[in-house]
From Swiss-Prot:
Highest taxon listed in the record's lineage: Bacteria
Protein name as it appears in the record: NAD kinase
Entry annotated with the keyword Chaperone: no
Subcellular location: Cytoplasm
Active-site positions on this chain: D77 (proton acceptor)
Binding locations of NAD(+): D77, G78, N151, D152, H162, R179, D181, T192, A193, Y194, S195, L196, S197
GO molecular function: ATP binding; metal ion binding; NAD binding; NAD+ kinase activity
Catalysed reactions, semicolon-separated: NAD(+) + ATP = ADP + NADP(+) + H(+)
Organism: Cellvibrio japonicus (strain Ueda107)
Gene assigned in the entry: nadK
Length: 300
């Protein structure tokens, strides 16, 4: 049976429903006699002083990642993405409680908190490894920006609506030059997010692959490409861009790039471990979240 000795709690700061669910989690962990720590900004949102005082410690994200053997993220998919980027380097597993809208990554619903947490604490869960992307921007051979992403790295025009010109290279080989609104480089995790909206394929989370999705390309033959998860992708910004392009990781970590800059994207060495309830099923998740069709005939 898996034993989690120290459990970290992180919540969406601007979501009162998330705060309420964290308070429920604290009471549940207290009843089970479990040590828990609170992320410092999360603790500041809890009005019941007795609950924050019950925490073993209140600490920042890095310290939390170093001492916890399980971190519960309460919020939407964005909250889990933020937690993943901050904690992947510490190899601490994450479990999501959904207080957002879609909930592709946050499995446990609010009404299931006590039941599903009891199962997890007794070892009844499924574990899954997901990879992140490392992104760096080089200018004249010098690294000027670094970031990582669980979902996607996006090259785009920022606030201006202009075509971008750039080249795509994979593993040192020139692939194509492109004029488009931008490019999405996505993990399997991100393939059900922005990449999907851009016409990219859905990749099963266990696939070791990266998908490259053009955004409104000027050439109709420019289609999404799936490459090996071990590939190094290089984007080179062209000369004839009327606006300074931007690079975004999971919707955050903006970096402004200019002519001649190189954007290098590769798999992050550290994998993220996600925990799921035992009844988790990726295809069921797609059906329920994306509105896929059910059985034509009810199973007997």
């Amino acid at each position: 049976m898996t034993h989690f000795s120290t459990i970290g709690l992180i919540g969406h700061l601007n979501n009162e429903r998330a705060v309420y669910s964290i308070e429920r989690l604290i009471r549940f962990l207290q009843q089970r006699g479990k040590d828990f720590v609170l992320e410092v900004e999360t603790a500041a949102r809890i009005s019941d002083i007795a609950l924050t005082q019950a925490a073993r410690q209140i600490m920042d994200m890095d310290a939390l990642g170093q001492i916890c053997d399980l971190v519960i993220v309460v919020g939407g998919d964005g909250s889990l993405l933020s937690g993943a980027r901050a904690l992947a380097k510490y190899q601490v597993p994450l479990l999501g409680v959904n207080r957002g809208r879609l909930g592709f990554l946050t499995d446990i619903t609010p009404e299931q908190i006590e039941q599903k947490m009891a199962e997890v604490l007794t070892g009844q869960f499924a574990s899954e490894k997901r990879f992140l992307l490392d992104m760096e921007v080089r200018r004249d051979g010098q690294v000027i920006a670094l970031a990582d992403a669980l979902n996607d790295v996006v090259l785009h025009t920022g606030q201006f609506i202009h075509m971008l010109e750039f080249e795509i290279h994979v593993d040192g080989s020139f692939v194509t030059s492109q004029r488009s609104d931008g490019l999405i480089v996505s993990t399997p995790t991100g393939s059900t997010a922005y990449s999907l909206s851009g016409g990219g394929p859905i990749l099963h989370p266990k696939l070791d692959a990266i998908v490259i999705v053009p955004m409104n390309p000027h050439t109709l033959s420019s289609r999404p490409i799936v490459v090996s998860g071990d590939s190094e992708i290089l984007l080179m910004v062209g000369e004839h861009n009327r606006a300074l392009p931007m690079v975004t990781c999971d919707g955050h970590s903006h970096a402004e790039v200019q002519t001649g800059d190189e954007i290098i994207i590769r798999k992050k060495p550290q994998l993220l471990e996600l925990l799921h309830p035992l009844d988790y099923n990726f295809y069921e998740r797609c059906r329920s979240k994306l509105g896929w069709g059910g059985h034509l005939l009810k199973p007997e």
